[in-house]
Structures are given as structure tokens and as C-alpha cells.
Amino acid sequence: MSLKHFIQITKPGIIFGNVLSVAGGFFLASKGNIDFGVFLAAVIGTSLVVASGCVFNNCIDRDIDQRMERTRNRVLVQGLVSLKLALLYATLLGIAGVGLLYTEANPLAALFAVIGFVIYVGLYSLYLKRRSVHGTLVGSLSGAMPPVIGYCAVSNSFDFAALTLLVMFSLWQMPHSYAIAIFRFNDYRAAKIPVLPVKRGILVTKRHIMLYILAFLVATLMLTVGGYAGLNYLAVAAGMGMYWLYMAWKGYKAVDDTVWARKLFVFSIFTITALSVMMSVDFQVTKELLVTYAF
């Protein structure tokens, strides 16, 4: 048991991705008027809550992880950290994160952190992941909470922009997760996890991917239509969304579904990273509907 093991069970890669989305939501709401104290509270607080959820997930999924090639060497599977200590660690991380958001940001930001945690640990990890093909859909809501937390840490309100972020990031999660399920198909089948490709086939999953990317593309444009983000953001969102859709369409002719799914997965990360950056820098200081640009 070492410090490295305690870091590993928090899934640092997932935390880093969530930090980017928290920052995107925060800077979108800040409109250039940045309170760095609140920013740090939002980033650190959300990171702690996400870390807590990941540790709990590691605890819950020990039996599943033993059956999957990519996870069978995880810290808890190997017994490098005891279950009791991991549960205590996860609890302390969660309390610290929610407490920081509540005291240094606002109660609304803390509330969304709690909602995301409950969905991820309670609904998804403990129940739906093992029992329902719809587990991915429910789990996507938890993955969409970080940008909402960042936004609400500034705005202290759940407005159209916050709703758009929630919908947008939830929709993004679906093709992203389905791509993983395709190129890790054998792992999911061995672990008896009822993801869409395993339960209904890869062709059906490809259709769902196309529909979710199309819906995601429309949702991303709403930040500019609603007067929250600018035309540069719009151009990047439209361009990357359409290319992601094109990549998904190419999946129907793919010779190797594993190779295609990996490429789709990688581009999904580029897409959401680019949009998080663009909403951070191309915000609208005064809210103007897109129709304003036409006159």
C-alpha cells in the first residue's frame, strides 16, 4: 500500500477530464469577471466528489473488474488497499468536496455535486450497470454534472445555459460510452455487463451513436442561439460535431469495428475538450440571441 495506490483508485484521468468541463461551465458563466477563489473551490470541490465516486465505484465493481482484462490489475482487485480503508477514503473525499462547494461556492453547486454522486454511485454503479441496458443513459447524467457545477458556482441559478450544458454533456456521454463498449466488447461480455452492443448488437449501437451525436450537435449550438456563447464557439461546435457525425456514419462501412470505435472514442475526447475551451474564451458578455447577428 502506497500513496500511488490511493491516487490510482481515484481514476486521475477521469478527474482531469471533469476539471476541463468544470472550467468550461465556470468561465462561460463568469463572462470574464473571474473570482479565482470560487474557481479553485469549484475545481477542487468537484474533483474531490468525482474522486469519491470513482473510489466507491472501484469498491462496488471488484467482482466485475476481476473478469475484465483491462481492470483485473486494479488496486482493489489485487488487494493492495483494503476495502474498509477504501470506503473510508471515499467517504472523506466526498464530504470534503461537497463541504468545499457548499461553503466556498454556493449550496446550489454543492447540490448538483450530490445529485451527480448519487446517480453515479447509487443508481448506476450499485444497480443499473449490472441489470439494465439503460444504465449508460442514467449514468450519463452524472457525467454531465461537472460543467453544471462550474456554471452554477458563478451564476447561483439553474437557467437555460445550465440546462443546455446538462443536456449537451449527457448526450456526449452516450456515443463516447458506446464506442468504449464496442472496442471493449469482449470485456463487457465476459463481465456480463448489459451494455447496448452486448445486448442488442453492434449494428443497433451504431444507429444509436448516430442519433445521439446528431442530438448532441443540435444541443451544442443552443449556447450561441441562446446568447451565451459567440460565433467562434458556434463554428467550432458545428465543425467538430459534423465531423464526429461523419465518423459515426463511416462506421456502417467499417471493416474493423474495434479500430473504428477507438477512433470515434478518441475524437469524442477532442470534441468535448475543444468545446470546453471555446465556451471558456468565447462567451457573450451581454446576452444576445443568435437572430441579433442577422441585423
Swiss-Prot record:
Its EC number is 2.5.1.141. GO terms for biological process: heme O biosynthetic process. It is a multi-pass membrane protein. The chain crosses the membrane at residues 9-29, 36-56, 80-100, 108-128, 135-155, 163-183, 209-229, 230-250, 265-285. Pathway: Porphyrin-containing compound metabolism; heme O biosynthesis; heme O from protoheme: step 1/1. GO terms for cellular component: plasma membrane. Keywords: Cell inner membrane, Cell membrane, Heme biosynthesis, Membrane, Transferase, Transmembrane, Transmembrane helix. CDD domains: PT_UbiA_Cox10. Coiled coil: none annotated. It is an enzyme of class 2 (transferase). One of its GO terms (molecular function) is protoheme IX farnesyltransferase activity. It is found in: Cell inner membrane. It catalyses: heme b + (2E,6E)-farnesyl diphosphate + H2O = Fe(II)-heme o + diphosphate. Carbon 2 of the heme B porphyrin ring is defined according to the Fischer nomenclature. Converts heme B (protoheme IX) to heme O by substitution of the vinyl group on carbon 2 of heme B porphyrin ring with a hydroxyethyl farnesyl side group. Belongs to the UbiA prenyltransferase family. Protoheme IX farnesyltransferase subfamily. This is Protoheme IX farnesyltransferase. The gene is cyoE.
